């Protein structure tokens, strides 16, 4: 059995790490490099950095902090934010990122996924999907430009359909960001993640809702995800990554130690 991964997420805005609730009302929680170093030391398996306003503001992630992070940590990390071209992706990988993630740009131009995969290989192409449960239609729908509340918009895609589409186009991993659960610490959306797991043949990373150690156990066992991403519980020191790994190992979950 492949070991499950724990992935702290650092949302970046104006050069600082921020955290919101349901993708709104972001507050500053710290500086990028010290937080990254702390999580690496605690035992994180990898890190994800989202420049949350890059796509909405028509720019690409700031490469200066990417290189500083690469100098300070020795675990893999992924960066996202406004990546729309092969050359932009190449620059970020050259600055030290191990993977690049695309979200809104892929919705604008789905062929970008295939072109990135052809150039760099499936293993370093991650697709982020911001999924919102629409109670009025009892369906999961994909949102775009979610890093800026004023710019957020609906798309034509239902979540399950987009999951299948990005796999056909060559993505290597999928991060499912469950917007309704984001930042509220009520647990991962096991139902939605299980539906996606059933149609997802690439590694699936759960995102949105972690509030207790048991939530990580439940999402690994019940939704069978490959990795669990979390932010506020780590930023606010509610959960220590090393202690979480010990807990999960005691619960019989294969975890990297």
UniProtKB/Swiss-Prot annotation:
- Describe its assembly: Heterodimer of HisH and HisF.
For whether the record's keyword set contains Cytoplasm, the answer is yes
| Gene name in the database record | hisF
Q: Write out the GO MF terms.
A: imidazoleglycerol-phosphate synthase activity; lyase activity
Q: Pfam families attached here? A: His_biosynth (PF00977)
Task: Return the protein name.
Answer: Imidazole glycerol phosphate synthase subunit HisF
Top-level EC class, please? Answer: lyase
Q: What is its EC number?
A: 4.3.2.10
Q: Which HAMAP family match?
A: HisF (MF_01013)
Q: Which UniProt keywords are listed?
A: Amino-acid biosynthesis, Cytoplasm, Histidine biosynthesis, Lyase
Q: Which organism is it from?
A: Shewanella putrefaciens (strain CN-32 / ATCC BAA-453)
């Amino acid at each position: 059995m492949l070991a499950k991964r724990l992935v702290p997420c650092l949302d970046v805005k104006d050069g600082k790490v921020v955290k919101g609730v349901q993708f709104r009302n972001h507050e500053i929680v710290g500086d990028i490099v010290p937080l990254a170093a702390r999580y690496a030391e605690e035992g994180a398996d990898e890190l994800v950095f989202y420049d949350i306003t890059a796509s909405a503001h028509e720019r690409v992630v700031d490469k200066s902090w990417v290189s500083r992070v690469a100098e300070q940590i020795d675990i893999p990390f992924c960066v996202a934010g406004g990546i729309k071209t092969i050359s932009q992706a190449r620059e970020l990988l050259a600055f030290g990122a191990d993977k690049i993630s695309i979200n809104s740009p892929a919705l604008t131009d789905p062929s970008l996924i295939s072109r990135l995969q052809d150039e760099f290989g499936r293993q370093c192409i991650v697709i982020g999907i911001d999924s919102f449960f629409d109670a009025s239609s009892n369906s999961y729908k994909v949102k775009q430009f979610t890093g800026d509340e004023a710019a957020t918009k609906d798309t034509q895609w239902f979540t399950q359909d987009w999951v299948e589409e990005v796999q056909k186009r060559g993505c290597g991993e999928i991060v499912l960001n469950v917007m309704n659960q984001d930042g509220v610490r009520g647990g991962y959306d096991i139902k939605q993640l299980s539906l996606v797991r059933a149609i997802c043949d690439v590694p699936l990373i759960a995102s949105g809702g972690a509030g207790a150690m048991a939530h990580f156990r439940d999402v690994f066992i019940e939704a069978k995800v490959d990795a669990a991403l979390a932010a506020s519980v780590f930023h606010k020191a509610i959960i220590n990554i090393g202690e979480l790994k010990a807990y999960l190992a005691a619960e019989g979950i294969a975890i990297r130690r």
